[in-house]
Amino acid sequence: QDAPGLWDVTFQTAVAQAELESREYPGFYHRIAFSFEDDSPIYIETTRPELLPACVALIAHPDDERYKPYFGKMVTSPLFNVRVPILAHPAAEMDKGAGIAMCCTFGDQTDVEWWRDLHLPLRSIIQRNGRIVMDMPDWITDDAGKELFEQIEGKTTFSARKIVVDALRESGDMDGDPKPTTRMTNFYEKGDKPLEIVTSRQWYLQNGGTNKALNAKLIERGKELNFHPDFMRVR
């Protein structure tokens, strides 16, 4: 199945957890308005506005009183005009930014966690070369959204970010100026650019971790094997 994995765009290689380095990386928080059906806004803050076309949901902590009334409701993304739900997940940080975040596929590992746990759609827009895909996503149906996406097709994430931020300023969907921040970001140990999370075809083996019947069957098959030394059978 298609699944996310860490990717270094410079070395053009997948990166294992053992090869990761977490480093401080400068960026900017952009306060962006999504809109309800009555056009009232709800604001999120993001360091990666170029991923707006890949947004699949807004996520807040289930105990956050500010957003409890909105769980299950739909909002529309700015510029690209795609409807997404507001959902609850315990990994959301109430004291970070606006306390509600957009989940995009994929900006970071938290996006991957939300995508898996909440069974969200896959809307990947970054290629292995680190550039925006050249094909128009089928979930963008609004003419204005299509026109803007055509402007970022094939661009680097840095160039796409500038185009999207300029468009947000022009549309009035960005509240104030971007605020500088520093965050911990994953790098390949040999690389000098932050890792991207791209999707690729991957194969999985069922090991019985979530299936008790399969687990019992595999244990019985394991008893048919000879282990040397025998105590390694239960390791």
Task: Locate the predicted segments by residue.
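NTP-handling and nucleic-acid-processing catalytic cores
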Residues: 1-129, 134-135, 139, 221-235
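Anion (oxyanion) recognition and catalysis
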Residues: 116, 169, 189
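Active-site cavity-forming subdomains of large catalytic enzyme subunits
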Residues: 130, 164, 188
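Phosphate/diphosphate-binding loops
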Residues: 155-182
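A glycine-rich phosphate-binding loop feature that marks nucleotide/adenosyl-phosphate handling sites
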Residues: 4-14, 180-191
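A glycine-biased structural micro-motif
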Residues: 69-72, 139-161
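Glycine-rich loop/linker segments at domain edges
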Residues: 183-227
